[in-house]
């Protein structure tokens, strides 16, 4: 396998299971390597050979559009043989356990497995059973490390830094793996983090993660450099956490009036998929302060960087 990226960064981990456990040097190295791939992806020839001869399996137990397609594009641009396995094609639907699925896949000697699962900790369980490297593409409400990395890259490219910025994360924090990974990363990189949500959508003891807490948008967005909106994850809700979508939007949905509570040059982010008219309106989502489309672009570059960094640790690298 030959590497084509200029950076000599090597991630000191066999897997990427979460932001927790990464050092500031790890995060910075991945962001710097991602910058190289941002430039590559804007060229006509986007191909590199750093994963040539390697097999990448995308194992998605939850439906995904952005993340799965982004990992597929990332692997193919680096020259990997990429296989996608979705919920409908997995033998777990026939009663096979996750451990048996892992052992079956391991017998085929994949080099990199990218996995999404509805259960927190499922990706770590898989990682203990396979010989290749494993990337967490989201596990329950636990972590989504590549989303946090692409968000950090987007912020750094637009604000020039992460240190000292105030990032307001608004919405369904309780069920959000994106919020958790972003909180860990942003705190590590010196940003201030404020979570904004009704009490029913805040995890107990969230303050222990080193965040400020606000329960209304006026207080929550005051002085914010970045406003990061989260959707209501109804698929993870077992009861009624909000009275109605319309009432939720009235109090916590981001529109121009509420955005004015933040700094005049504040930028808006959303990990997707968006529920327009629930947590964000179209004028803001499509407006000049929105970075939402840029986040999607950064996702491919970040996932290329992660795949390459892990591949450099493989025995045949």
From Swiss-Prot:
A single Gene Ontology CC term: cytosol
Binding-site positions, carbamoyl phosphate: 66-67, 116, 144, 147, 272-273
Gene3D superfamilies hit by this protein: Aspartate/ornithine carbamoyltransferase
MF-aspect GO terms: amino acid binding; aspartate carbamoyltransferase activity
Signal sequence interval, chain numbering: none
Pathway where it operates: Pyrimidine metabolism; UMP biosynthesis via de novo pathway; (S)-dihydroorotate from bicarbonate: step 2/3
Family per similarity comment: Belongs to the aspartate/ornithine carbamoyltransferase superfamily. ATCase family.
Role according to the record: Catalyzes the condensation of carbamoyl phosphate and aspartate to form carbamoyl aspartate and inorganic phosphate, the committed step in the de novo pyrimidine nucleotide biosynthesis pathway.
PANTHER family reported in the protein's UniProt record: ASPARTATE CARBAMOYLTRANSFERASE, ORNITHINE CARBAMOYLTRANSFERASE, MITOCHONDRIAL
Record protein name field: Aspartate carbamoyltransferase catalytic subunit
